Swiss-Prot record:
NCBIfam families: rpmF_bact (TIGR01031). Residues 7-16 have a biased composition (Basic residues). The keyword Ribosomal protein applies. The keyword Ribosomal protein applies. It comes from Vibrio cholerae serotype O1 (strain ATCC 39315 / El Tor Inaba N16961). This is Large ribosomal subunit protein bL32. GO terms for biological process: translation. GO terms for cellular component: cytosolic large ribosomal subunit. It comes from the Bacteria. Keywords: Ribonucleoprotein, Ribosomal protein.
Length: 56
């Protein structure tokens, strides 16, 4: 098993972890159905940018 040769400082640890933060998902409301969905994704009803693209 690998063991580090020198201890990493709190600063180095923090700099490494600075990119680990989670961001909230970007949500949109569809103009036609008023449904909330992920950006650039089809709604559950099959609408994308106000047009029906999937028939259920």
């Amino acid at each position: 098993m690998a063991v580090q040769q020198n201890r990493k400082t709190r600063s180095r640890r923090g700099m490494r972890r600075s990119h680990d933060a989670l961001t909230a998902a970007a949500l949109s409301v569809d103009a036609t159905s008023g449904e909330t969905h992920l950006r650039h994704n089809v709604t559950a009803e099959g609408y994308y940018r106000g047009k029906k693209v999937i028939n259920k």
